[in-house]
Amino acid sequence: MTVTIKELTNHNYIDHELSATLDSTDAFEGPEKLLEIWFFPHKKSITTEKTLRNIGMDRWIEILKLVKCEVLSMKKTKELDAFLLSESSLFVFDHKLTMKTCGTTTTLFCLEKLFQIVEQELSWAFRTTQGGKYKPFKVFYSRRCFLFPCKQAAIHQNWADEVDYLNKFFDNGKSYSVGRNDKSNHWNLYVTETDRSTPKGKEYIEDDDETFEVLMTELDPECASKFVCGPEASTTALVEPNEDKGHNLGYQMTKNTRLDEIYVNSAQDSDLSFHHDAFAFTPCGYSSNMILAEKYYYTLHVTPEKGWSYASFESNIPVFDISQGKQDNLDVLLHILNVFQPREFSMTFFTKNYQNQSFQKLLSINESLPDYIKLDKIVYDLDDYHLFYMKLQKKI
């Protein structure tokens, strides 16, 4: 699938002033904090008339200020709202949200305000009578170890402090340190037990939810250079009243690196909707949100600075089903690695179905990556999810 130039003109919201003045010169921390909250198991399970998508833009801006990031632009489909942020992305569905923020953002500081807003504006009551904590259907919070932990806000400098803070809000949370337990090579996960008492609704059909994430460090210099803006790409002035160079250059970076061609689909599925929103930062850096079939997304974020280059990819696309068996997440991974050629990378794959085609294919990935050696390979059974984690390094 590929994007077209019309994707530059169909935003539901865009902050041209922020886009024109945003400067990434002092940015340094690529690895993101990833927060995913399922308030209900499905949109058909929601017990009131309003959903998360009824929350206004001004309220999301208020929430994101607590995180220390801003909204660059937003696109809506029938199923989700995709926000491109000054520091990564936010995806809002009717019943759940995924917030991914890099740099020195304070992701966890939005929790109190977020639950206040859903209670006041949506009449969603998740506070328990005992202890005053919240009990949504499911919560995930994860991040790899930071490149510069001492530069984070105090709450995010230490994983144990983050877990303590999360435990003030949620019951039944469990913490995992996945991979080699050193300062630079592990991945952290916090997940709550599924609240099976949450009403599912008469029409509820369980979704075989899956999420694939690839976190890459030490990118090939030539590959990283494709995400650097030249001196002619000054954003001091807008091209036209409804355009800005950051989004224009983001579109060009997407096309030049073929990041819009990660997923293929069969001939009869060629009419699947595909939306794109990307931004190129000055002097360097790239963020993009892609929406497939109205309800699936994949997002990429790149900090190409020499010495701490980093790129991430995350997707909830059920690739085997969407492609009708023509592609799986191993194919997706190989495409991504070809774009960035990292010296090291880790990947995580969550699925509810252990027999998932991509899950089984990724388990035997070694033979498909002859240029890499395995550092870690771990499988977890997490309540109603299976997690596969693997870390690899290029052969010297």
From Swiss-Prot:
Site (Cleavage (non-hydrolytic)): 87-88
Cofactor (UniProt): pyruvate
Note, other: Present with 7060 molecules/cell in log phase SD medium.
Family: Belongs to the eukaryotic AdoMetDC family.
Sites of Pyruvic acid (Ser) modification: 88
Gene Ontology MF terms in the entry: adenosylmethionine decarboxylase activity
Cofactor, free-text remark: Binds 1 pyruvoyl group covalently per subunit.
Organism for this UniProt entry: Saccharomyces cerevisiae (strain ATCC 204508 / S288c)
EC number: 4.1.1.50
Record's comment on post-translational modification: Is synthesized initially as an inactive proenzyme. Formation of the active enzyme involves a self-maturation process in which the active site pyruvoyl group is generated from an internal serine residue via an autocatalytic post-translational modification. Two non-identical subunits are generated from the proenzyme in this reaction, and the pyruvate is formed at the N-terminus of the alpha chain, which is derived from the carboxyl end of the proenzyme.
Coiled coil residues, start to end: none
Gene symbol of the encoding locus: SPE2
Protein name per UniProt: S-adenosylmethionine decarboxylase proenzyme
